[in-house]
Amino acid sequence: MSISPGGLATGIGSLPHLDAAAAVDLVRRYCPAIPHWPQLPRANKREYFTYQNLQLLLDLGLLQIEGDRHALFDCDAPEWPERVAEFYGIYLEAAEGSQQALDRLAFSPGAADGWDRFCDDLAARGYGGARFLKGQVAGLLTAGFEITDPGGRPAYYNPQLRDVLLKQLSLQAAWQARSLGRFGLPALIFMDDPVIYSCGMSDRIGVSREEVLTELNEFASFVRSAGGLVGVHSCADLDWSLLLEAELDIISFDAYQFASSFVLFPELIRSFLERGGVVAWGLIPTFHGGGEALAGENLASLQGRTGRLLQELERRAVDLRLLQSQSLVTPACGTAILSEPEAVRVYELTAGLATAWNSLFTG
């Protein structure tokens, strides 16, 4: 299924709020067409991605937590082979359509208060004029370089551990897609993976472009099988051809900082748009310059920046009609590191630029 959102506003995921109700109210006020459930990492350590996205691996004993956050695969445990086999059994059952198996991926109590409040709010108030609902999971490379084996080596470098992480994140994303789909709207599920920038870097020689592309496509295929549309978000600069060539529905990136490198791939951008892809333009700064960039911008200045970006894309023979219809307007990244007033301003500017989107293509 392809979509034409026409510059609608949504967010990336995280907010600085401690109160889930206030966070949901903010999202629904400024992103009414594509509300997302808010991640609240400041509110509770269990909102950290290890607990939020990898709870099944903890439940099965595949992962252990050291201290508050450091997670490692317990590969040396005598029960490791049986635990891995149990995990793959759950994955295969879910892949064959078992809702009971997929429900093993439900967030544990306290791990996603924003999700709980978001879904309760949708059930109580309805979804108003929403056209889509959005969820998000951690990225494979981000998780794979933070989680280690017992010797401290990043899990991503171990093919078995990497595959377990990929399938776990695919399951979690599919569970979100299926759960949001029950409200009767299409679900957009983003994999948030800033560490994907490391693909092809000399100090990450174990990160193969071909393997990353294959993994992205496997993730996308699995989530689509649960009824979701699939995006990847990165707030770091990278070789954008990787995402443009992947089988994704949406590419989300920090356009405030990195539009100049993204536009260097006009042929791939054209091809991506022509096959129905959507670009989520992160046009509102979130942390660039330690907050100074946000303080120095207003709606008029952001419209000017966006207009110049569109002119550059047109100069490179990218079809503006496709850009107009197949775009989203978002913050550059999540807003958890900002203050609550700064986060509100980011969302205000996002909504304002989305409202002005179509006017940028006239005159």
Tell me what each language-model feature is.
Residues 126-131, 181-186, 274, 318-325:
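Short helix-terminating capping/connector loops at secondary-structure junctions
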Residues 37-40, 134-138, 190-192, 231-235, ...:
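A cross-family glycoside hydrolase active-site/sugar-binding cleft signature
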Residues 142-147, 197-201, 290:
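Short acidic/His/Gly/Ser-rich catalytic and metal-binding motifs that mark active-site loops
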Residues 1-157, 277, 312, 325, ...:
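Alpha/beta catalytic barrel-like cores
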Residues 135, 154, 160-266:
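Active-site loop segments of alpha/beta catalytic cores
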Residues 119, 123, 177, 216-225, ...:
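Surface-exposed amphipathic alpha-helices with a cationic face
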Residues 249-362:
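Catalytic-face loop-and-helix region of soluble metabolic enzyme cores
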Residues 103-120, 159-175, 301-309:
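Glycine-rich anion/phosphate-binding loops
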